[in-house]
A protein has these predicted regions:
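Active-site histidine-anchored catalytic micro-motif
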Residues: 1-135
Length: 136
């Protein structure tokens, strides 16, 4: 049995998953599995990771429907026979606090949920996205 924590990452897009510097279409964002493929090994090797791509949008385009999708995904996985030790949501920084507040109100789980974001996209020198993902 592995001693690594089992973390489920839910991708929603945002700057942390943006590679082009444009925020016009879904093509400007990389899916969560591709984001982790680009990440340094230190980011992905300290935990057993599983992934769900919820959406990949600019956070200003996220709607309450996406919030409910996140809630449903987290609650379904939390109540499974083998729930993760924690959840990490990759998100755009513009509206991450709204999503976090909504989830704080509606989630009925003791499993930690962390929302993380970035100010510089992964295509830029000095991006903090991978460090933020690691810290989450």
């Amino acid at each position: 049995m592995s001693s690594k924590p089992r973390i489920h990452i839910l991708g929603t897009g945002g700057t942390i998953a943006n590679i082009t510097g444009n925020y016009i279409s879904a093509a400007d964002f990389v899916p969560i599995d591709a984001l982790l493929d680009l990440a340094p090994e230190e980011v992905t090797s300290h935990a057993e990771l599983s992934l769900t791509e919820v959406t990949h949008l600019n956070s200003g385009a996220l709607t309450p429907e996406v919030w409910f999708d996140l809630q449903n995904e987290i609650m379904q996985r939390s109540s499974s026979n083998n729930p993760p030790d924690g959840f990490v949501i990759t998100h755009g920084s513009n509206t991450s606090e709204e999503t976090a507040y909504f989830l704080n109100l509606v989630l009925k789980t003791e499993i930690p949920v962390v929302v993380t974001a970035a100010q510089r996209n992964i295509g830029k020198l000095g991006t903090e996205g991978f460090k933020n993902l690691y810290d989450a």
